[in-house]
């Protein structure tokens, strides 16, 4: 039940998530106070004062239902997403992707929200978290310092922090399990890591490729942040071979298992170097490359990291990225509704929750907005099915392992697997997952 006596809901931030949340609340007949500081205080990234501005790319990525983000967009269309609707109206040719005229699209979103009779737009910076009403905080990946500090305090001084790098994540089903082995260093605890052993020859070839690979350019607003964070693997490698062999590729305590039949240097019991893969989701379908945060171009990541034994044909569900970002320890702090566990009147949405990408941010705003509206009306919360893309995102960010939690794009690896024998053909498997998702979503909507 709602614990607020106010006759409106606050939404802080009019980016993709905040705009979507405000619209979803207002369409359910509830007044919204939408706060946006752009217009009175600029950010390093934004070029306009329009809502839902696309800062970097103008692409909403793949549009096919055999692409997880394509499935997510279709689900959002069926849920009347203001972001998807205006994006569709301002599409530009982009092959199999959905790209938009960024100015026309953002202007349309802004006009629709500003003209909505139930949405009051307030152009000012919020430095305190309102306690007068149910509130959705969607202040973006570079939340202003004052508000960031308040969120930090609200969460008990824990869980609102910066990251400068993320390592690539691969689909376990595409790892060659004949070339890797399960083991924890020195056999401590359960065998929790997949280990990719390298001979000296394999390591030297990999090292050469890594140190000569092309890095992605930094946006101007990222340059200062680049040097503040954890070190990219390619920068570490350029400090010398020993930096790698005594660092992320240290082989000590990771001896070959007795039944290992792959290549090795002579009769050595320990590989020359080892790349470790760590389980990344509860279902065990995703693994990240431990210590391999990177800022290489995506094509270079694929080329270089597929040199790792066992990853020759690996499918990367997320490439490594390097940029400063604010995000929460969502597994400990948020419910699957994007509602605060400690304050039921408070919701969070957007990249600060640990979803990565334009579409994912808007989707989180949609879920948070719907649930904020339901709380206002005294109705039960809704949790979208884990078989859908829009249900799998909040499930992932609230059920991931907190210690190693990092932002995530939507991908088929986080959606609940199909029942029955695994379909080997990837396209057919994804088609079946999408078919089930849309069917389950429609059943959910009709209920």
UniProtKB/Swiss-Prot annotation:
Binding site for FAD: 13-18
Pfam families linked to this entry: GIDA (PF01134)
Cofactor: FAD
GO MF terms held by the record: flavin adenine dinucleotide binding; tRNA (uracil(54)-C5)-methyltransferase activity, 5,10-methylenetetrahydrofolate-dependent
Highest taxon above the source species: Bacteria
EC numbers for this chain: 2.1.1.74
Keyword Acyltransferase annotated: no
Keywords: Cytoplasm, FAD, Flavoprotein, Methyltransferase, NAD, NADP, Transferase, tRNA processing
Record carries keyword Ribonucleoprotein: no
The reaction(s) this protein catalyses: uridine(54) in tRNA + (6R)-5,10-methylene-5,6,7,8-tetrahydrofolate + NADH + H(+) = 5-methyluridine(54) in tRNA + (6S)-5,6,7,8-tetrahydrofolate + NAD(+); uridine(54) in tRNA + (6R)-5,10-methylene-5,6,7,8-tetrahydrofolate + NADPH + H(+) = 5-methyluridine(54) in tRNA + (6S)-5,6,7,8-tetrahydrofolate + NADP(+)
A biological process from GO: tRNA methylation
A cellular-component GO term for this protein: cytosol
Subcellular location per the Swiss-Prot or TrEMBL entry: Cytoplasm
InterPro entries, alphabetized: FAD/NAD-bd_sf, MnmG-rel, MnmG-rel_CS, MnmG_N, TrmFO
Similarity comment: family membership: Belongs to the MnmG family. TrmFO subfamily.
General function of this protein: Catalyzes the folate-dependent formation of 5-methyl-uridine at position 54 (M-5-U54) in all tRNAs.
Protein name, UniProt field: Methylenetetrahydrofolate--tRNA-(uracil-5-)-methyltransferase TrmFO
Source organism per UniProt: Streptococcus thermophilus (strain CNRZ 1066)
């Amino acid at each position: 039940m709602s614990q607020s006596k106010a006759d409106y809901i606050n939404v802080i931030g009019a980016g993709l998530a905040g705009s979507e949340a405000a619209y979803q609340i207002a369409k359910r007949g509830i007044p919204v106070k939408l706060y946006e500081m752009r217009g009175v205080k600029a950010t390093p990234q934004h070029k306009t004062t329009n809502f839902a501005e696309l800062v970097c790319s103008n692409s909403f990525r793949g549009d096919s239902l055999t692409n997880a983000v394509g499935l997510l967009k279709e689900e959002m269309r069926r849920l009347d997403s203001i972001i998807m609707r205006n994006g569709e109206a301002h599409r530009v040719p982009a092959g199999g992707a959905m790209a938009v005229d960024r100015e026309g699209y953002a202007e349309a979103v802004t006009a629709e929200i500003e003209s909505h009779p139930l949405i009051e737009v307030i152009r000012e910076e919020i430095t305190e978290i309102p306690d007068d009403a149910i509130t959705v905080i969607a202040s973006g990946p570079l939340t202003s310092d004052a508000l960031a500090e308040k969120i930090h305090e609200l969460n008990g001084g824990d869980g609102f922090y910066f990251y400068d790098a993320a390592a690539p994540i691969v689909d376990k089903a595409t790892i060659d399990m004949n070339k890797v082995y399960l083991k924890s260093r020195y056999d401590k605890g359960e065998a929790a890591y997949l280990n990719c052993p390298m001979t000296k020859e394999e390591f030297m070839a990999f090292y050469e490729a890594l140190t000569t690979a092309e890095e992605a350019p930094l946006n101007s607003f990222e340059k200062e942040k680049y040097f503040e964070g954890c070190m990219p693997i390619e920068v570490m490698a350029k400090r010398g071979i020993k930096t790698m062999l005594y660092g992320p590729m240290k082989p000590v305590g990771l001896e070959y298992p007795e039944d290992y039949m792959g290549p090795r240097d002579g009769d050595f019991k320990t590989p020359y170097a080892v790349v470790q893969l760590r389980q990344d989701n509860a279902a065990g379908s995703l693994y990240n490359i431990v210590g391999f945060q990177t800022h290489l171009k995506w094509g270079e990541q694929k080329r270089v990291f597929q040199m790792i034994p066992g990853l020759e044909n690996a499918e990367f569900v997320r490439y490594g990225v390097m940029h400063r970002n604010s995000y929460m320890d969502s597994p400990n702090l948020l419910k699957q509704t994007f509602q605060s566990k400690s304050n039921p009147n408070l919701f969070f949405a957007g990249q600060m929750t640990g979803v990565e990408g334009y579409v994912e941010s808007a989707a989180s705003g949609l879920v948070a907005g719907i649930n904020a509206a339901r709380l206002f009306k005294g109705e039960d919360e809704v949790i979208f099915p884990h078989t859908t893309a829009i249900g799998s995102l909040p499930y992932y960010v609230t059920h991931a392992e907190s210690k190693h939690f990092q932002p995530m794009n939507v991908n088929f690896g986080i959606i609940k697997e199909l029942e029955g024998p695994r379909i080997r053909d990837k396209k057919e498997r994804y088609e079946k997952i999408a078919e089930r998702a849309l069917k389950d979503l429609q059943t959910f909507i009709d209920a």
